[in-house]
Amino acid sequence: MQNFDKTAVIDAANALPGRLTPMPVATLHVVNGHSMTHVPEGMEVAIFAMGCFWGVERLFWQQPGVYSTAAGYSGGYTPNPTYHEVCSGRTAHAEVVRVVFDPAIISYKQLLQIFWENHDPAQGMRQGGDVGTQYRSAIYVLTPEQETQAQESQALFQQAMTKAGDSRAITSEIAAALPFYYAEDDHQQYLYKNPQGYCGLGGIGVCMPPNL
């Protein structure tokens, strides 16, 4: 047990069992007052992992056309995990942000550009000083169209990195979305509630080519 590697994704057989009861979630987003759970007609959902979800959630709630955001966990096996369990590396979940957006105002392609340009997608199971599988970079897609656009955007950003002299390979996971589990209320809109709180978010200085 002492030799457990938090940078290796655990398999389902060894993941924590979790629980049947969902995490209680606030009714309204504290920044904009919108519903934390409802997706209004005509709006769409995106799920991104870019390291610690505190800064990621703030990045997206600041975007015009984003209706609501929520910090949570996805990509793993443990149902309804706690933050402590996710940090143990024994759930296989990543820290993610669920973004509800109006595609008439901000497109999924624009959200992808924000994703690629605002973190380091070539660090594997870490993001800066935050180390562990929960900090991996990932795009969890909900439709075939999202998958196609995510794959195309990754190829373009890889080209942009190479052109900028960064020879590393992108390690971001692109996969079909598994169940999204809300994080504890303390983590929702964390940097609004704690303006001086930790934010490890930062890009690598590479811009997405304009033909995304």
UniProtKB/Swiss-Prot annotation:
Keywords associated with the record: Oxidoreductase
Catalyzed reactions: L-methionyl-[protein] + [thioredoxin]-disulfide + H2O = L-methionyl-(S)-S-oxide-[protein] + [thioredoxin]-dithiol; [thioredoxin]-disulfide + L-methionine + H2O = L-methionine (S)-S-oxide + [thioredoxin]-dithiol
One of the Pfam families matching this protein, by short name: PMSR
InterPro entries: Met_Sox_Rdtase_MsrA_dom, Met_Sox_Rdtase_MsrA_sf, MsrA_MetSO_reductase
Record flagged with keyword Oxidoreductase: yes
Superkingdom of the organism of origin: Bacteria
Enzyme active site: 52
Role noted for this protein: Has an important function as a repair enzyme for proteins that have been inactivated by oxidation. Catalyzes the reversible oxidation-reduction of methionine sulfoxide in proteins to methionine.
Family: Belongs to the MsrA Met sulfoxide reductase family.
Matching PANTHER family: MITOCHONDRIAL PEPTIDE METHIONINE SULFOXIDE REDUCTASE (PTHR42799:SF2)
Protein name according to UniProt: Peptide methionine sulfoxide reductase MsrA
Lineage of producing organism: Bacteria, Pseudomonadati, Pseudomonadota, Gammaproteobacteria, Enterobacterales
